A protein has these predicted regions:
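Short acidic/polar hinge/loop motifs at secondary-structure boundaries
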Residues: 3-5, 22-50, 69, 166
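Outer-envelope beta-barrel architecture signal
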Residues: 14, 75-79, 91-93, 102-108, ...
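Extracytoplasmic loops and strand-loop junctions of Gram-negative outer membrane beta-barrel proteins
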Residues: 28-29, 48-49, 77-80, 114-118, ...
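Face-selective signature of the C-terminal outer-membrane beta-barrel domain
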Residues: 197-352, 364, 370, 375-381, ...
Length: 391
């Protein structure tokens, strides 16, 4: 729906970073790309490493590692407008600008985008608005950048499976999400606001320092704020699910809102050495997630049928090195220690479960992740490698 797979790997097994900062959600270990609208317009590169990747920050990576690097501010000023349109009223408008380098050291760059579509499936519209802004100082040995991007999305639910029977009865574009029953004339009715709504704001402060021709370090602080909810119509369901009745047999129609508000912040750093046949990196990071989940029933503004809080603290240190011991043949070693503390407090959205509010999860995890390998470039464009890794 809004996920990316690598060789069929579940998205929760893929580690995704931007400028080395963890981008995957700390709880689900997934990145929902609908919250990154038009981010590709500001990328310098995207590196995808299949399998267990080298040590990085954020969630564990069993299937792949993806690192996105945002583009540099160019030396020349420009203003650009990109317009595109397609089937099902799909459209994209992007305005871009850059100051170029001011006084040979300063610059600012930005983008404003609007993306939308009515969708192939019935009512499956998409409304995405986003911006990207960066400003910084660029010296011979020092680069300091402030980067921020924002995304506001609204999408109609379209994640239900459509059976062959439903397609034969109602057409290939049939979407059962939001079904409310039939009116007096036998026409199907659907809930207009069966939507997902989310706002996400990202901030990064990046410092790159070159110490000499072989040595440099990078330090990045980051903060992400997310707020949103999805609303859905529940038809003829037991009211006890929302605490609206004590009778398990009493049923009714309910419009529920499941809401989320979260903060994710931390810092990462690395020291890098590269000279002759040896390259090495020592680094690590500390990150914390603090999220509130709560549910409301439309029509009862002061009523919450659940609220819980989850916190996740994650820190790691790693060292990795590669050495070319023969022409075209190199060996690498990569060692990482990672610690995770995860707590969650009830009640959950299963009404009445552990309603005393005790922590139902309070666990610490420690991981040691070694990786070793040999790489042999025996012909131009031909490479043989073997590796062993634990993630």
């Amino acid at each position: 729906y809004t996920t990316l797979r690598v060789r069929g790997t579940d998205p929760s097994r893929i580690n995704i970073t931007s400028n080395g900062v963890p981008q995957s959600d700390a709880e689900s270990s997934q990145l929902f790309w609908v919250n990154m609208a038009d981010f590709a317009s500001n990328l310098q590169s995207m590196q995808i490493q299949r399998g267990v990747g080298t040590s990085t920050n954020g969630t564990g990576a069993f299937g792949a590692t993806i690192n996105m690097l945002t583009e540099n501010i160019g030396t020349k000023p420009y203003v650009g407008l990109d317009l595109s349109a397609g089937s099902y009223y799909s459209h994209k408008q992007t305005v871009r600008f850059s100051s170029g380098l001011l006084n040979e050291h300063w610059g600012i760059q930005g983008r404003l985008s609007n993306i939308g579509s009515k969708g192939y499936l019935d009512r499956a519209f998409t409304k995405l608005n986003s911006y990207f802004l960066q400003a910084g100082y660029f010296g011979d040995n020092t680069v300091v950048k402030f980067i921020t991007w924002n995304n506001q999305e609204q999408t109609y639910h379209a994640w239900n499976y459509t059976s062959k029977y439903e397609q034969s009865m109602y057409g290939r574009s049939y979407n059962s999400c939001g079904y409310m029953g039939k009116d007096d004339n036998g026409n199907m009715m659907f809930f207009d606001n069966q939507t997902d709504n989310y706002h996400q704001q990202n901030y990064q402060l990046v410092w790159n320092q070159r110490l000499n021709s072989a040595l440099n370090f990078n330090v990045t602080g980051h903060y992400t704020r997310g707020d949103g909810y999805y609303e859905q119509y529940k038809r003829n369901k037991p009211l006890i699910n929302w605490g609206l009745s004590t009778n398990p047999d009493e049923k009714g129609n309910v419009i529920e809102q499941k809401k989320l508000g979260n903060d994710f912040y931390g810092a990462i750093a690395s020291l890098n050495y590269s000279a002759d046949k040896l390259s090495a990196t020592f680094g690590g990071g500390w990150n914390k997630y603090d999220g509130d989940h709560f549910g409301k029933v439309v029509g009862k503004p002061n009523y919450e049928y659940y609220r819980n809080n989850a916190k996740k603290t994650d820190y790691n240190v790693y060292g990795k090195a590669s050495y070319e011991f023969l022409e075209g043949m190199s060996a690498f070693v990569d060692l990482q220690y990672r610690h995770v503390n995860y707590t969650m407090q009830d009640p959950t959205d299963s009404y009445g479960s552990n309603a005393d509010g005790k922590y139902i999860i309070d666990d610490d995890f420690n991981f040691f992740n070694p990786k070793f390998g040999i790489n042999y470039d025996f012909l131009p464009g031909q490479r043989l490698y073997i590796s062993y890794a634990i993630a």
